[in-house]
């Protein structure tokens, strides 16, 4: 596996996770 594609995959996972956490926190409040 290429290191660049691996870095992109990690970046997308972190971005999606943080985005869902923000939406979750706002709906929770």
From Swiss-Prot:
Q: Which residues form the signal peptide?
A: none
Q: Which GO terms describe its molecular function?
A: electron transporter, transferring electrons within cytochrome b6/f complex of photosystem II activity
Q: Which UniProt keywords apply?
A: Chloroplast, Electron transport, Membrane, Photosynthesis, Plastid, Thylakoid, Transmembrane, Transmembrane helix, Transport
Report the membrane topology from the UniProt record: Single-pass membrane protein
Alphabetically, which GO biological process terms does the record hold?
cytochrome complex assembly; photosynthesis
Q: Where in the cell is it found?
A: Plastid, Chloroplast thylakoid membrane
Q: Which InterPro entries match?
A: Cytochr_b6-f_cplx_su8_sf (IPR036143), Cytochrome_b6-f_cplx_su8 (IPR005497)
Disulphide linkage map:
none
* Coiled-coil ranges from the UniProt annotation: none
Task: Write down the Pfam families for this protein, in alphabetical order.
Answer: PetN
Question: Which positions, given as ranges, span the membrane?
Answer: 3-23
An example Gene Ontology CC term for this record: chloroplast thylakoid membrane
Q: Does the keyword Transcription regulation apply?
A: no
Subunit structure, per the record? The 4 large subunits of the cytochrome b6-f complex are cytochrome b6, subunit IV (17 kDa polypeptide, PetD), cytochrome f and the Rieske protein, while the 4 small subunits are PetG, PetL, PetM and PetN. The complex functions as a dimer.
Q: What does this protein do?
A: Component of the cytochrome b6-f complex, which mediates electron transfer between photosystem II (PSII) and photosystem I (PSI), cyclic electron flow around PSI, and state transitions.
Query: What family is reported?
Result: Belongs to the PetN family.
The molecule here is called: Cytochrome b6-f complex subunit 8
- Point out the gene that encodes the protein: petN
């Amino acid at each position: 596996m290429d290191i660049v594609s691996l870095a992109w995959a990690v970046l997308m996972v972190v971005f999606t996770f943080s985005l869902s956490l923000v939406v979750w926190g706002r709906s929770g409040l």
